[in-house]
Amino acid sequence: MAKPKKKVTRIRRRERKNIERGHAHIQSTFNNTIITLTDVHGNAISWASSGQLGFKGSRKSTPFASQMAAETAAKAAMEHGLKSVEVFVKGPGSGREAAIRALQATGLEVTMIKDVTPIPHNGCRPPKRRRV
């Protein structure tokens, strides 16, 4: 019986983009935090989330998890030459400030912080209040 041929897979290394200025989009919900670093046109350079790093369940929504996600995304983006970012924060989650502090701590210069949380003009009915 003939042995199946093994496929040779090569890992293609991404070429280094020389981008010095960019945007950091932090989407912080009640359940997770997603950080995406883009260039000024909105093309993604790197991204990370709390769930991607192995945090499960309620630990995804902690400030520590969003701090780790921000550090991971920032280090990956700094390999492409990113030096300064404008931060756009969206959502009501607990990891907003921790993610911004983590971006500054990794060496990225934060030039602007803007809250872009969508506020409804009496749109959808909100979820019912929790009774604990």
From Swiss-Prot:
Keyword vocabulary terms for this entry: Ribonucleoprotein, Ribosomal protein, RNA-binding, rRNA-binding
Statement: the UniProt record of this protein carries the keyword Ion transport: no
Gene3D superfamilies in the record: Ribosomal protein S11
Record's GO cellular component terms: ribonucleoprotein complex; ribosome
HAMAP family: Ribosomal_uS11
Subunit and interaction comment: Part of the 30S ribosomal subunit. Interacts with proteins S7 and S18. Binds to IF-3.
Annotated family: Belongs to the universal ribosomal protein uS11 family.
Name the UniProt record assigns to this protein: Small ribosomal subunit protein uS11
Lineage of producing organism: Bacteria, Bacillati, Bacillota, Clostridia, Peptostreptococcales
